[in-house]
């Protein structure tokens, strides 16, 4: 069986969540490439596939096993990055580097979500670093629409990193991190508005408004008094925008699903606000 056939089989196994078998098949494909200075595209694809397999396994594992699997994933994504940089077609090279940087960012993000305290903070910082590199590479893509789309993905992940950090932090640090999250999500929204495909633009704007609403809701739950009230108002405003965008989606089933999400989050806003108000009434 040739290298391409083995890669194809390996990726099919990955899609079926047979990760151990996929890893074995992809390593078999890599072993068939005797001259590692040749077949760079194939090697790039193999390393990306191995990174994805180990990442999926790491997310499900616990303790030292999870840590080791994350290490394996990072190693393969680093290998992919080195190969992507060697690709002769500059635009393809940039695109593959973007995928590798995203993979690395995702590895550290998922580790950070499992960790606590200083370790979690450090891992989030690594994730941000890789997502920033992803963003920088995305801005260099010649195809404007693809460049916008890839920048949207990077801004979304940066926003998510800061949002999850902010939830774990307290006081001024939490407030500052929420501010960073909002900043990236606002940039995501502005980029989404520039997409030429109207339906894709609406979907991406919807996603950004959801992220913004979620940020303000979490801040509101941590805040007190008038500050909390104002933040709840901002959360409601963004989820209302999310709802309006969802109503404009042409795919009826997707539109209904997105409207359900928006209505659910609006309900959460009012519910959380009522709970806090009730607590303050009891206090006084």
Question: Where are the model-predicted features located?
Answer:
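Conserved alpha-helical positions within TPR/SEL1-like repeat arrays
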Residues: 7-15, 42-59, 95-110, 149-164, ...
């Amino acid at each position: 069986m040739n290298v391409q056939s083995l890669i194809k089989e390996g990726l099919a196994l990955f899609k079926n969540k047979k990760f151990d078998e996929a890893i074995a098949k992809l390593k078999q494909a890599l072993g068939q490439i005797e001259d590692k200075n040749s077949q760079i595209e194939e090697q790039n694809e193999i390393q990306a596939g191995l990174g994805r397999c180990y990442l999926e396994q790491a997310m499900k594992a616990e303790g030292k096993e999870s840590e080791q699997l994350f290490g394996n994933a990072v190693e393969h994504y680093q290998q992919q990055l080195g190969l992507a940089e060697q690709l002769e077609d500059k635009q393809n090279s940039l695109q593959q580097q973007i995928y590798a940087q995203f993979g690395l960012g995702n590895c550290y993000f998922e580790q950070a979500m499992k960790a606590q305290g200083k370790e979690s903070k450090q891992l989030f910082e690594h994730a941000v670093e890789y997502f920033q590199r992803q963003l920088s590479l995305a801005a260099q893509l010649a195809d404007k629409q693809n460049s916008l789309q890839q920048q949207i993905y990077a801004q979304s992940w940066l926003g998510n990193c800061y949002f999850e950090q902010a939830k774990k932090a307290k006081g001024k640090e939490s407030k500052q991190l929420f501010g960073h999250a909002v900043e990236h999500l606002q940039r995501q929204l502005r980029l989404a508005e520039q997409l030429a495909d109207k339906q894709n633009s609406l979907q991406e704007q919807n996603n950004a408004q959801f992220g913004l609403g979620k940020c303000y809701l979490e801040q509101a739950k941590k805040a007190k008094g008038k500050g909390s009230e104002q933040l709840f108002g901002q959360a409601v405003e963004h989820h209302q925008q999310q709802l309006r965008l969802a109503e404009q989606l042409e795919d009826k089933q997707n539109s209904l699903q997105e409207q359900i999400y928006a209505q659910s989050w609006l309900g959460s806003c009012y519910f959380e606000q009522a709970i806090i108000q009730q607590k303050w009434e009891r206090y006084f």
